Amino acid sequence: NKYNIHLLKEIQLCPEAITSDCIYTISCIDGVKGEKSSPKWLKDRIEKSGIKSINLLVDLTNYILLEQGQPLHAFDKDKLSNLIGKEASPEDFSVRKAKDNESLVCLDGKKYELNKNITVITCCDKPVAIAGVIGGLETSVTNTTSSIYLEGAVFNPVTIRKSSKAIGIRTESSSRYEKGISSKNTIGAVTRAINLLEEFFTIPLPIINTSNFINNEDTFIKLRRNRIHKILGPLIINDQFEKRNLSDTEIVDKLLLLGCNLESKEYGWDVAVIPNRSQDLIREIDLIEEIARLVGYDRFDLNLPNPIQPGKLSSEQLALRDKEWFCRKWF
């Protein structure tokens, strides 16, 4: 990573919202231009996904959401500074529970009355966003924006669900957080966003400030060739007259489509899953299901093996059954 990563030692974080496997990052990026519109490829990409194009800065955060599965939020640095009465710094940010007498006007133009069930992002203790759900209007990016603070975080899904329910809205970001995302990819997603910003603007090299460092070492899932064949069965070739198992090449191709890294083994493969899929690809059966989905469920033989082996009780289960029968008969 060509960017400096700085540990925020003094940042105040709500322990319920930022648990040990979560992360909060904030990066100051100067030299941007809020009036710059997005190129056609970027507009098309986000609008095809049902997201309205706003400007290049906002569109890039939404693009990273779609590409990496990591929500990002951009604050206008000058507006933050005006709000708190001094130049905003990374140490001014915090994550806490809202207070009962607080309110926040959000990006949708509505004023929300806050309470202790809602988690907020603050700058010098002033709420500037509802964490993981929606940003505040007062510090939003507009055509006059020249500097931003880029937030990339992973919050506890339970706190996001509570906040979303309390204010009665669900956003693209909150829906991702509620399902749970991996903090292993957060700094990578922020880095990707900064790389894209560098393609459009001349910006000083930013520092990525983070609440903690996440172990990004690959964890491997053992994927057995014979297990794939047993679970999925053979492929149907030539209108059911010919059948065969998936070849190693076909299996590897599908895993590479998922972005996995592979190590060949005698039994099959050790599979390292990319961070933004590490929440849903956890077990061997998860990988097998994805292979089947990418190949096409309808391409596999639907007929069960013949003869079908009936299930039977083990000797221990038989002994337990007999014991229970005698107990019921008062022996």
Regions found by a protein language model. Give the residues of each.
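RNA/tRNA-interacting regions in translation and RNA-turnover enzymes
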Residues: 1-321, 325-329
